[in-house]
Amino acid sequence: DTMGLDIGSAMLKWVIFGPGDVYYELKNYAIAAIPQCLDYKQVKDVSRMVAILKRTLLEKTRVKNCVLNIPDHLVCSKWIQIDHSAYENLDEIIAILAEQSIPYPLKDLYFDYQRFYPAQQNQDNFKVLLAACRKEHLDFRLDIVHQANLTPIAVELSSQAIVRANYYFYPENRYENRMFL
């Protein structure tokens, strides 16, 4: 089993999904207030956040692996089109495009990308989703996770996690337009 963990500005939330008869099922969850531990840009009390996380975990589960959620407002993301002929140099091209597209020095960022298959209308290019986060925002969350004796196996944007969950739990509606609030 793996835990999904969201460290927000006012709440700490986690869920655990595990294999069910046919699909993954919700096995456990917790929501805990973290008042005055974090505001929009500043961490106020990491040790208190770790204590809250450990307390909720020990009460309900022994799961150690987690997928860490990061809010979209802390991430700069951009869709880019890249010619198929550039595939062999993709890492270099992504670094150049990140430098041009993101208003922070690359040394201050963690960034990653995901390649998507070409759109039907343009088979010569493929789409790439580039995502970058300032190290300070992710490092503080990773510090909390490590101090709580959890192992982060992935970091995912909030919006991408919601879309992925929708596709998993409602595959028959995959091509319908949806709005998530």
Where would I find each of the regions flagged by the language model?
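Gly/Thr-rich phosphate-binding beta-strand-loop-beta motif of the actin/hexokinase/Hsp70
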Residues: 1-33, 64-69, 168-181
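Cytosolic/nucleoplasmic/matrix-facing N-terminal domains/tails
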Residues: 3, 48-58, 74-75, 131
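Amphipathic alpha-helical transducer elements in NTP-driven molecular machines
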Residues: 10, 46-53, 91, 138
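Short, glycine- and charge-enriched coil/turn segments that flank and shape catalytic ligand pockets
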Residues: 21-22, 38-47, 117-125, 169-176
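Switch/connector loops and helix/strand junctions flanking conserved nucleotide-binding motifs
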Residues: 24, 40-42, 75-79
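N-terminal phosphate-binding loop and adjacent alpha-helix
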Residues: 28-58
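Active-site neighborhood for divalent-cation/phosphate handling
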Residues: 65, 69-170
